Amino acid sequence: GIIPQISVILGPCAGGACYSPAITDFIFMTEKTSQMFITGPGVVKAVTAETVSPEGLGGAGVHSTKSGVSHFVCKDDKETLEAVRNLLSYLPQSNLEKPPVAEKSKAVDKSKEIEEIVPDNFKKGYDVREVIATFADKESFLEIQKDFARNVVIGFARMDGNVVGIVANQPNFIAGSLDVDASDKASRFVRFCDCFNIPILTLEDVPGYMPGTKQEHNGIIRHGAKAKGASFLIGDSGIS
């Protein structure tokens, strides 16, 4: 974590070339034109007899909803580059600097209060994004991996112009329980924020780790430990 690293995939990316973007901090992909896969459809068919299209194997939709490889998906190249520029506005140039402060931050959206959003009945769900809107500068929340592991919401926001990282359980999706994917998603983001001096705000509303054979067999102990370990990194720069 010396400098933030961003990969922009604007076309097919196959074989060993996939590993380089995979070790960077953020990956952008475009709809219909971006693909990432270790072996292409031809090799897959020859080895496994499975027929699959490039898009179905490693398109933007696959990596933004199933694999979690992609962090942002945009409609075209122009929108992608604009999104990269927007992300950079939240990040420091290196681990020796603090995140940039916005000179003109928009006032907090006070159309709803937290009491109106969070129900008294703990069995009822709500959208945690609405809670974030009650304290973050208006339109400042930049959600990351919004379609992957939707039981956890992560992203950058500004509070009085200052950048913060937000990690929040999403009660609207499987009650905000932590599973393998959510643990990976949250822990990776926390580690990034820790590397680049970004304070973390955690919104906790979680019944626990998701039970069941699927989660146990997929390694919930191993992946869940990542989330637990990452929480120890927050230290004095975090609020829960």
Regions found by a protein language model. Give the residues of each.
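Ligand-binding clefts of soluble mixed alpha/beta catalytic domains
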Residues: G1-S240
